[in-house]
């Protein structure tokens, strides 16, 4: 699931994914965060 968070590296997505979905797994794809939910 993509969220509207800009990123350059995957670890920048972990906290936003945790906040949005309660899971700290995700990666940066195409400058946007994708959370694995």
UniProtKB/Swiss-Prot annotation:
Q: Name one GO molecular function term.
A: potassium channel regulator activity
Alphabetical list of InterPro entries matching this protein:
Scorpion_toxin-like_sf, Scorpion_toxinS_K_inh
Name the keywords, alphabetized. Answer: Calcium-activated potassium channel impairing toxin, Disulfide bond, Ion channel impairing toxin, Neurotoxin, Potassium channel impairing toxin, Secreted, Toxin
User: This protein's superkingdom?
Assistant: Eukaryota
- SS bonds (residue pairs): 7-28, 13-33, 17-35
Site annotation (Aromatic residue of the functional dyad) points to 36
Q: Which Pfam families match?
A: Toxin_2
According to UniProt, the tissues expressing it are described as: Expressed by the venom gland.
- State the family named in the UniProt similarity comment for this chain: Belongs to the short scorpion toxin superfamily. Potassium channel inhibitor family. Alpha-KTx 01 subfamily.
The role this protein plays is: Reversibly blocks the high conductance calcium-activated potassium channels composed of only alpha subunits (KCa1.1/KCNMA1). Unreversibly blocks the high conductance calcium-activated potassium channels composed of alpha and beta1 subunits (KCNMA1 and KCNMB1). Unreversibly and weakly blocks the high conductance calcium-activated potassium channels composed of alpha and beta4 (KCNMA1 and KCNMB4).
Give the domain section of the comments.
Has the structural arrangement of an alpha-helix connected to antiparallel beta-sheets by disulfide bonds (CS-alpha/beta).
Q: What is this protein called?
A: Potassium channel toxin alpha-KTx 1.11
Source species: Centruroides noxius
